[in-house]
Amino acid sequence: VGSEMCIRDRRYILQKINNNTFRDVAGLMENITAVTEFLRTKTDDLRGVLTLVKTNDGASYLHAQDAYWRTYDFVEDSICLQLPETDEDFYQSAVGFGTFQQLLTDFPAAKLHETIPNFHNTPDRYRALLETLERDPMHRAVQVQPEIEFALARQAEMSAIQNALASGKLPLRVTHNDTKLNNVLLDAKT
């Protein structure tokens, strides 16, 4: 963070990006930049939109010593829960994700990079499952036969989403794809 950007008592969150999972760090950060900038045009509640802090040269992340880093403004009076303390915690996290999805209904999804190729391609995942079952490299398949049979019995349904996308019956939309409790900041006071 450049000294001209430093404000007294301004706090930050510095995150190391897992580039083993997200191999296209530039694409990931372009996605985050595009989505957060778009969200700012859709809501007056700017506290609900992450603020990415740029590097001195205007980049959205830093690559140094084989590691990738990004910085966000710290959201004051917020909490991040690993486990729910009440049913309301789950409800409010669902409200957060629902609001996120609703605000992005008209975002041009085709502009986003696929940061983990085929991660949500169910037929591709199914093929990988079959290949792994055939090899059974850890010799554990016998221990999970009911689960394997459950998946195998649903082969016909595995292509439903990909087919609907390809036919145009299902529009391409932005989704969060990691909707878990600790990916939502909750208001610490309410």
Language-model regions: role of each:
Residues 1, 47, 170:
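Structured loop/turn residues at beta-strand edges in well-structured enzyme cores
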Residues 8-11, 188-190:
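Active-site beta-strand-loop-beta-strand hairpin of nuclease catalytic cores
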Residues 11-31, 37-111:
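ATP-binding pocket architecture of kinase catalytic cores
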Residues 15, 22-26, 75-95, 106-176, ...:
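ATP-dependent phospho-/nucleotidyl transfer catalytic cores
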Residues 179:
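Hydrophobic HxD+1 residue recognition
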Residues 1-7:
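Short, small-residue-biased leader/transition segments that mark boundaries at the very start
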